[in-house]
Curated annotation (Swiss-Prot):
Protein's job: Catalyzes the NADPH-dependent rearrangement and reduction of 1-deoxy-D-xylulose-5-phosphate (DXP) to 2-C-methyl-D-erythritol 4-phosphate (MEP).
GO molecular function: 1-deoxy-D-xylulose-5-phosphate reductoisomerase activity; manganese ion binding; NADPH binding
Enzyme class: oxidoreductase
Binding annotation for Mn(2+): 150, 152, 221
Protein name as it appears in the record: 1-deoxy-D-xylulose 5-phosphate reductoisomerase
Cofactor (UniProt): Mg(2+); Mn(2+)
One of the GO BP terms on file: isopentenyl diphosphate biosynthetic process, methylerythritol 4-phosphate pathway involved in terpenoid biosynthetic process
One Pfam entry name: DXP_reductoisom
Length: 387
């Protein structure tokens, strides 16, 4: 039985992870849970999974949480705030920490888990995008495993099993095209929040669904793939695959192409990251290629999706620039979801912020440099959105 700690337990990845634990109680047990502020979801999770320790990022609700579970025996340790989330990440005998926290808020807890010797099931891509120059050396220093738990990078990781070192030539990241794949470019000025949140294939949280609509999600995944698999940006490509059946592909040195296929279900990559190197038998719906039908591909429209080109440029710039891109995107998407900017303002504000930072970029940023760049970018987007 593998001991698991889950960060971001009340979000989309978190709830699906707990579905897996509930379905396979002989395979996994929960050591710790960390959540943001959703007590209505967290309290039933605590009662069902009986973690040893629980963190609530929103410190103001800690007393309410204590009162709600006062009848439990034994009582879990309750901690709060960002420091509490880091404490949970490093706690106890958990073998693997599933990082389902959205955004750069997952960076410090992931580092805490690595330093405590935990393997990381990485569903929080922002940790690598913003913190790659710091996180990767720590992974090597502490001898832990970094296992991708999002569909595309899990697909690449699975395809690479058995490929010798140096055998990888090219990565092909598939993208559904998001909510606006069939919209003309000139209609994007009329986009509403409801429009942006209608993902055609996947059930995900709001932020990542908007990222899919701008294709920034795929741009961020290009940077993540660079850090995870070591390929340069000229050998990482994006292709539109509307059916989301092929989750990504690799080309090896002899030009053979390997792909991983499955229904669009986030539980699959999460389960593989939790159970690797084992394969757990499930009763989930099996892929029927006749039912799936035609599998089609096309080149992404760069006029419709300017965030892709921007992400490639930022990735090549390196240093702290990816942290700026990520933070600017997080802030711009939050403003859009709060109805304070329009959809087309998202790429405009991100590009402006990255341009302003380019002269400040440093090639080998420290953790402090990355966190400072993150805060600077958020403030820049806020200020620019008011003009």
């Amino acid at each position: 039985m593998k001991a698991i700690t889950l960060l971001g337990s009340t979000g989309s990845i978190g709830t699906q992870t707990l579905d897996i634990v509930a379905q396979y109680p002989d395979q996994f047990r929960i050591v710790g849970l960390a959540a943001g502020r959703s007590l209505d979801k967290l309290i039933p999770q605590i009662r069902q999974f009986r973690p040893q320790i629980v963190a609530l990022a929103d410190e103001q609700q800690l007393d309410d949480l204590k009162a709600a579970i006062a009848d439990l025996d034994p009582q879990p340790i309750l901690v709060a705030g960002p420091a509490g989330v880091c404490e949970v990440a490093a706690y106890g005998d958990a073998k693997t920490v599933v990082t389902g926290i959205v955004g750069c808020a997952g960076l410090l807890p992931t580092i805490a888990a690595i330093k405590a010797g935990k393997d990381i099931a990485l569903a929080n891509k922002e940790t690598l995008i913003a913190g790659g120059p710091v996180v990767l050396p720590l992974v090597e220093q502490y001898g832990v495993k970094l296992l991708p738990a999002d569909s595309e990078h899990s697909a690449i990781f699975q395809c690479l099993q058995g490929v010798p070192a140096g055998g990888l030539r090219r990565i092909l990241l598939t993208a559904s095209g998001g909510a606006f794949r069939d919209w003309p470019v000139d209609k994007l000025g009329q986009v509403t929040i409801a429009d942006a949140l209608k993902h055609p294939n996947w059930s995900m949280g709001q932020k990542i669904t908007v990222d899919s609509a701008t294709l920034m999600n795929k741009g961020l995944e290009v940077i993540e793939a660079h850090y995870l698999f070591g390929l340069d940006y000229d050998h990482i490509e994006i292709i539109i695959h509307p059916q989301s059946i092929i989750h990504s592909l690799i080309e090896v040195q002899d030009t053979s192409v390997l792909a991983q296929l499955g229904w669009p279900d986030m539980r699959l990559p999460v389960l593989y990251a939790m159970s690797w190197p084992e394969r757990i038998a499930t009763d989930w719906p099996r892929l029927d290629l006749l039912k799936a039908g035609d599998l089609t591909f096309k080149e992404p429209d760069h006029a419709k999706y300017p965030c892709m080109k921007l992400a490639y440029a930022v990735g090549r710039a390196g240093g702290a620039m990816p942290a700026v891109l990520n933070a600017a995107n997080e802030q711009a998407v939050a403003l859009f979801l709060a109805e304070r900017i329009a959809f087309l303002d998202i790429p405009r504000l991100i590009e402006q912020t990255c341009d302003r930072f380019s002269s400040k970029n440093c090639a080998e940023p420290s953790l402090e440099d990355i966190l400072a760049a993150d805060q600077w970018a958020r403030q820049e987007v806020l200020l620019a959105s008011q003009n």
